[in-house]
């Protein structure tokens, strides 16, 4: 067996990010051949990934990347097994690299990102293989759970990530005054993260959902002994309250409690003589 030098071990560690003892073992198993040692470690990572496939990866982080010109953005959730790994530089750096690759490559889905190729910093591997390599490096199951790419060629994207990176939101708006609307867009992204709306406006609430909620409220009212002639009014009142909870434009604005989001949009229109249209938003909370 050829002599394995400390420099070779260090070089392999610098290349792969794997621990010193594992690097030494890889070099010993491959007769000191650096390329074969790298491949050995990749295979080891793939084997560990297969072994840990059934493990529960419920920790991790929400990563958001937005283009400098605000014309595109991406939000993704990357999972691991423990909070300790989720907070580490290796994991967060990997999540950031995936987010940047998804942004630059306009990845339409998590599946599309898995087929893209990372930079040399991550071995020039496809994301699918790099996740296996990262599993071997960190000793935990790593999983790309979900991803949404937002194309805002007709407007701009803003985002908010809550401290701890377990909650985040991205929003796409359109306005004839995009520069003036950026601060409002950031506030709206924070609104989405904090208040968890499900649709932009009332018209987007599925009819079957309203029918379901109405039936629940009706049964509750009857169960409380309310008279039949008052039940419809009670149900309608509760449905209005439901709209205020789940419709973004009807929610109380988190920065000014006596104003709705729709009021804030109206104030912007008056001040800037330009409307702001909310095109779409995505909210991710870790583990949902």
UniProtKB/Swiss-Prot annotation:
Described function: Associates with the EF-Tu.GDP complex and induces the exchange of GDP to GTP. It remains bound to the aminoacyl-tRNA.EF-Tu.GTP complex up to the GTP hydrolysis stage on the ribosome.
InterPro entries: EF-Ts_dimer_sf, Transl_elong_EFTs/EF1B, Transl_elong_EFTs/EF1B_dimer, Transl_elong_Ts_CS, UBA-like_sf
Lineage: Bacteria, Pseudomonadati, Chlorobiota, Chlorobiia, Chlorobiales
Localisation per UniProt entry: Cytoplasm
Protein name as catalogued: Elongation factor Ts
Organism per entry: Chlorobium phaeovibrioides (strain DSM 265 / 1930)
Keyword match DNA-binding: no
Cellular component GO terms, alphabetical: cytoplasm
Domain of life: Bacteria
